[in-house]
A protein has these predicted regions:
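N-terminal beta1-alpha1-beta2 module of alpha/beta enzyme domains
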Residues: 1-66, 157, 304
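Active-site-adjacent beta->alpha loops and helix N-cap segments on the catalytic face
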Residues: 44-53, 183-199, 304-309
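Active-site mouth loops of central-metabolism enzymes
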Residues: 6-19, 68-75, 153-163, 212-215, ...
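Short, acidic/polar
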Residues: 16-28, 81, 162-174, 225, ...
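Conserved, mostly hydrophobic/aromatic
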Residues: 32, 54, 85, 126, ...
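Hydrophobic faces of well-ordered beta-strands that scaffold small-molecule active sites
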Residues: 6-12, 36-38, 63-66, 93-97, ...
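Alpha-helix-loop-beta-strand connector modules within alpha/beta enzyme cores
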Residues: 45-68, 72, 121-125, 129, ...
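An alpha-helical appendage that flanks or caps ligand/catalytic pockets
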Residues: 2, 112-148, 190-290
Length: 320
């Protein structure tokens, strides 16, 4: 079972075929890696069924769900799903709920007028249900009348909020048991996020996502991942704008393009993700642990064969 040390695992890419989840889960479990994170992006594979598949074929592995869109299910059903998963593998579930991509929510006719309010109401309701309470609430988005789970978890897992911005982080600090921070979640971003949440890492479960690329030749890893970093810079989310060298990085990319990213200082790459040599990867995850992170999910290559080979890298990082 998981220890007090930061746990490291693999993120199951949304494009992977669902039958691959049991193979990768078993490989991680045998190797001693701590976690597998399943991703629910619309309209790819579903998080709950992937999590159930992974939990039932493993003995020690924690499985995180990162994340379920808050308004895609009734919160009573979400709580039932989480309670059932915890019953299948007590103590090995890390459930996450987030805003969801709003354009996807609109496609389903489920886009809320206030993503922040809807997420807060869902987190509170699901948390109360998992705690075994009889819940009656009539909010803007959650309407429950005397709902109580028949089999709530004996020890409810921390309910994690998949959030990014200051207002959402502050809300998560009030009502959630932790956060899932999307990639590239480096140590500077983690410290900023904890500050926004108004929480300390000793009582708030911080999970981060990153991308993994370990090569013997550091520059080769940079060449492989430069297009990914370019996309991150184009999106300019708080995960990248929070890094202390963001202005210099953005200017470098604007002036020199991908070549400028490949040749940027190695320590910038190490801040952003486990990209470079294995020593660089160790340095990155150690910095995350010092920043207060408890769980790290790493995206492998979307190429299945390459991803299979990267399981060994994740096992090595987990055994550090």
């Amino acid at each position: 079972m998981p220890t007090n040390r930061m746990q490291i695992g693999l993120c199951f890419d949304r494009t992977f075929p669902p039958q691959l989840v049991t193979e990768l889960a078993r490989a991680l479990d045998r190797g001693g890696a701590g976690q597998l994170w399943v991703i629910e992006d619309c309209f790819y594979t579903a998080g709950v069924s992937l999590a159930a598949s992974a939990l039932t074929v493993t003995e020690q592995l924690e499985v995180g769900i990162g994340i379920l869109p808050a308004v895609a299910r009734n919160p009573a059903v979400t709580a039932m799903e989480f309670a059932t998963l915890d019953g299948l593998a007590p103590g090995r579930l890390l459930p996450g709920i987030g805003h969801g991509v709003q354009t996807w929510m609109a496609q389903m006719g489920a886009r809320p007028a206030s993503p922040l309010t809807s997420l807060e109401e869902v987190l509170v309701a699901v948390g109360r249900l998992l705690a075994g309470e009889n819940v009656t609430t009539h909010g803007h988005y959650v309407d429950l009348d005397g709902v109580q789970l028949d089999q709530p978890p004996a020890s409810p897992p921390p309910l994690l909020a998949g959030v990014r911005g200051p207002r959402s982080l502050a809300m998560a600090g009030r009502v959630a048991g932790g956060v899932v921070l999307a990639e590239p979640a480096g140590p500077a971003y983690v410290r900023w996020a904890l500050e926004q949440a108004g929480r300390r890492p000793d009582d708030f479960h911080v999970a981060t996502f990153g991308v993994l690329c370990v090569q013997r030749d550091r520059e080769e890893a940079y060449r492989i991942m430069a297009p990914w970093l370019a996309r991150v810079l184009d999106e300019a989310t708080t995960a990248i704008t929070a890094v202390p060298f963001y202005d210099d990085l953005a200017a470098r990319y604007a002036e020199k393009g991908l070549d400028g990213l490949v040749s940027m200082p190695p320590q910038w790459w190490t801040e952003l993700a486990p990209i470079g040599t294995m020593d660089d990867a160790f340095e990155h995850v150690d910095a995350l642990e010092r920043a207060g992170v408890r769980s790290v999910g790493l995206y492998p290559s979307p190429d299945v064969e390459v991803a299979r080979g990267q399981v060994a890298d994740i096992v090595a990082l987990a055994a550090r």
